[in-house]
Amino acid sequence: MSDFKQSGTIVTFPRLRPRDEAQREKELVTHARRTPLALIIPCLVSELEQPALAGMVARLAGTPYLDTAVISLDRADAAGYARALEYFRALRLRTMVVWNDAEPVAAIIREIEMAVLNLGPRGKGRAVWVALGAVIAEERAEAVAFLDADVVTFERSLLTNLVYPILHPALDFDYAKGYYARYSDRLHGRVTRLMVRPLLQALLNTVGHHPYLEYVDSFRYPLSGEFAVHATLLRRLRIPSDWGLE
C-alpha cells in the first residue's frame, strides 16, 4: 500500500522525498490567511490519561498555520471537563472544548431530534457531527482537518502534509485523506483487510460499475481518521451523526 501506483478515481500523493518542514509550514501560514484552518479531535475523557494524546498535544503545540483547535469531549463529568480545559492549554492555540455531556449540548440535541431527525446513538460520529456544527456556526474556518486522538506515532508533518493540498490555492483539492505505511512483525488494518475490502469487492461484483463504490475502493486506508475538507464542500455534505468508523 506504500507504492507509487495511481489507481482508481483519486490522486494518491506518496512522500516522494523529504522537504524542509519549516518551509512547508511557512507556505501554509501564508495560505491559511486566506483559508483559515480548524482542527477537530474527538476524544473520550479517558484518553487524557493516554500517552498517545499527550504526544499529539506536544507536537501540535503552537502550530503556526492552525487557526482553531476543536476538542469534542465525550464521557466527561464537570471535573473531567475542567481537566480537559487545563490539559489542552498546552496546545497554545485558540481552542474550543465542546463538552458533549453538558446539559446545554444535550438540550440542543433533544431539540434537533424533536424537530428534525433522530441522530442515532452516541459515539465518535456524534462527537464529530457536533464539533462540525460548532465550526460551521462560527463561520470562521474555511477548511477543517480531523485527527483521531490515539495516533501513537503522530508527527506534525502528518497534519502538514494532509492539509497542504487543501490550503494551497494552486492545487484545487477539496478533500484529502491520510494514509501511511506501518512496518512491524504484525498485520495491521484487520477491519479493512477482512471486512471493508471484501465487502466493497462483493458489492462491485453484485452491482457492477458504480462511481461511488469505485471512489471508496480507491483509497489506500478508507477507515483512516485523518482527513481534511474545504468548507465549500463541507457545507454541502449531508454528514451522518451515528457512525462509529469512518
Residue ranges and their predicted role:
Residues 48-52, 120-128, 155, 191-195:
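Phosphate/oxyanion-binding active-site loops and adjacent basic polyanion-contact surfaces
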Residues 152-181:
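Conserved donor-nucleotide/metal-binding helix-loop-beta segment in metal-dependent transferases, i.e.
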Residues 80-140:
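Active-site-proximal specificity loops/subdomain of glycosyltransferases
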